């Protein structure tokens, strides 16, 4: 009797379990695996941070793959040429813009994130948040098929020093707080929310201003919870920008910068419970 089939199953179960067990306590948990998440994860993982991305779909990469209207090319501003060179991504220059093959770009982003040590879990949905002492401290996860089929199966918890909403247009994590009235508590930031406590929706297309807006609105929206990418646009009520991805990359890099600063602050602080002082 051949043991090859058994060994294949054993190896998959063993190594997936090891991987999942390793991320139950992380520095950063990210919901959604779009370009901002990949840029953020790559930077923090390079710094030795433990980063886990949870993507509900089977194919991580967010909106990169389809380019513009399924023309699988995408555009970045020429200011991002350094980033493409640093990550060995092929591109073509056209005036003040850069054109990149969408499939190549998505593949390269995924490769660089995982090569540097970030974990990516596809088919895993972030259904809720962990909160300790009025601070977001991780995510609650379940299999996406469980959610789609509405099966009565309890989720499990991943504890994180910082959590990031990278769910794109829906801004799922922020809305989890908004619908409970938590986002407007005394410790929450409400400057870019409606007075009624409902999160704004993104405005119509305006690529130039949308690219600026997404970076400016990448921030900590509630203690322990950051927004970036299209989630930051939706939360702030900014304009969408379509198949230009410079703002997405810069948003992820901005989030990485902000979170790295906070992680260093925690390391030098006597505050061991990750609660802001």
Swiss-Prot record:
Pathway annotation from the record: Cofactor biosynthesis; thiamine diphosphate biosynthesis
One Pfam family here: Thi4
Gene Ontology MF: a single term: pentosyltransferase activity
Binding site for glycine: 240
EC assignment: 2.4.2.59
Cofactor(s) needed by this chain: Fe(2+)
Entry keyword Ribonucleoprotein: no
Top-level taxon: Bacteria
Cross-referenced SUPFAM superfamilies: FAD/NAD(P)-binding domain (SSF51905)
Family: Belongs to the THI4 family.
NCBIfam families: sulfide-dependent adenosine diphosphate thiazole synthase
PANTHER family according to UniProt: THIAMINE THIAZOLE SYNTHASE
HAMAP family, per database record: Thi4
Subunit and partners: Homooctamer; tetramer of dimers.
Protein name per the record: Thiamine thiazole synthase
